[in-house]
Curated annotation (Swiss-Prot):
Keywords assigned by UniProt, alphabetized: ATP-binding, Coenzyme A biosynthesis, Cytoplasm, Kinase, Nucleotide-binding, Transferase
Localization annotation: Cytoplasm
Pathway as given in its UniProt record: Cofactor biosynthesis; coenzyme A biosynthesis; CoA from (R)-pantothenate: step 1/5
Record GO biological process: coenzyme A biosynthetic process
EC numbers on record: 2.7.1.33
UniProt binding sites for ATP: 101-108
Name the record gives this protein: Pantothenate kinase
Family assignment from sequence similarity: Belongs to the prokaryotic pantothenate kinase family.
Source organism: Clavibacter sepedonicus
Amino acid sequence: MADTATGSPTSHGHVSPFVEIARADWAALAPATHLPLRETELVQLRGIGDRLDMREVEDVYLPLSRLLNLYVTGTKKLHRDTSAFLGERAKSTPFIIGVAGSVAVGKSTVARLLREMLARWDDTPRVELVTTDGFLHPNAELERRGLMERKGFPESYDRRALLRFVTQVKSGVPEVRAPFYSHLAYDIVPGAEVVVRQPDVLIIEGLNVLQPAASGAKLAVSDLFDFSIYVDARTHDIAQWYEERFLSLQRGAFSNPRSYFHRYAELSPAEAVARARGIWSAINEPNLEQNIRPTRSRATLVLRKDADHSVANVLLRKL
């Protein structure tokens, strides 16, 4: 018996806000015209450990990009009609997509791929991607608050700054700036910024983008999304992917003397596995279970992955 994104059964008379679509049925929804995407581009978009291939793109992400294109077109028309009804001049505002999910689940790859595919549709040539990493408090501030071991948890972010950024973009501000985060330094880079200039589509990717409003706040970042995606998988599969990614980084990026995690570069294979599992158990799994997965039911669409990273089925919120 299949489960919905809320964890409730989809059969035996139970009501769900989602319709569950098997991969084969979803793939059949792909438009006849293929969007141009070369294998060399796919290699650049693929995350560490992700097994994304052209078959996956055609079966899963081509139909998704078409669905998003329909949502963009429909939202623009509704905006124009509403402006006409109010007797106002229609002002174009970006269509905002949120992409959420656990560490190592592949949400960054999904976000990058959608950025490239949506930019190939005629009516959305300007697509920007911003990750919420830039809205983490700097390490010095996290240390001051005793939150370094909870980096990635909701309280480690400057949620007001993120909300202000998305509000300004959605309001049509010509140029909006966000802090820049370095994964090498594992910190915000002072003076460096990401600049967003009125895109057709803005993708916001991060662990907690579907979180409800913070205590005392009237608005959540997700309230400003036109569409949201949750990348889902079984916990034990994500844990395995995280371990594989950690080992890959240990052999690669961690060997850079400037890497924040350079101290892990000389670990033995057994020590590296133990360290990866320790980080997962102490930080990433609790964050997934306490904060990230509970937001799954807030998404417009859920991509549910199997152990090999391929999407097995899609859950789409009923209109």
